[in-house]
């Protein structure tokens, strides 16, 4: 007797044989390091209008030794290294140059495990690592508080200057894209010893989690031509670990003005990835490409952001839009297929944030030059 085997059974057997993408452990080596950061390297020119900064704009970028620090500040950031010796920084690929102040992208598929070896290379600042969204146990939370843990479970709380600690984070299904999400989503990681101080000092970065099988061997997503990660944040330098050092270096006469409202306002940097007034580089794509944007926010009550792209539209969970809503600590993933070549404005639509420089350009090159 000849049995007829349905074609769907062959397909099922083939899929079972191939199986899902194998879960792996991905290891990253990050160092927290002091850096001299420039919020507006184009100064004295504002790239948004290609003219000199106006008097109102100079409040946020011009230093004068007496009343304002300016556009350069000592900060801390996460820097990726090639191995546990922490001797050779890993070069940031051109496609991620737009990350600016942010730490490196940590990638994982659902089912993977992330091991992040953190070395504190600052001289005085205690640091840690805390992820959003992922599964971690008490020895890898990265937050010091009265949680009933003890012994080895407290080693993650604080990494002192010169110290090294390995954080282990799992990526279960509940940390990955949901039913209505695209093939990848984004989470934040940041230092959490003193979250307000640590994040305003600059210790923050992105985690991108994709569905199994969506990440190619070269580290790029299937079906996506370009990815951009942008953090909208008013970095409050008044609350930075390095405030005193910045005053001493760039505005020594302002040492007695730390409670002055005008001085404090000049230290609030309305930034996109740590850049003001269209200094954010690298947001370039081609007409018709599949472009994924990961949008992040951190901060306080002033960090209510509405990212807006001129010239093109995006899709979020089946909805067409050109403006998003971001609250502090939120993460959004949206897709764009640009059909309108040109150099376009990309900014927060909150008026006060526009005035203070929370804006950038993105460029869509024509499909056929």
Label each PLM-derived region with a short phrase.
Residues 1-3:
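N-terminal secretory signal peptides that target proteins for export/translocation
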Residues 22-369:
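Copper-binding active sites and cupredoxin-like electron-transfer domains
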Residues 6-16:
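Bacterial N-terminal signal peptides
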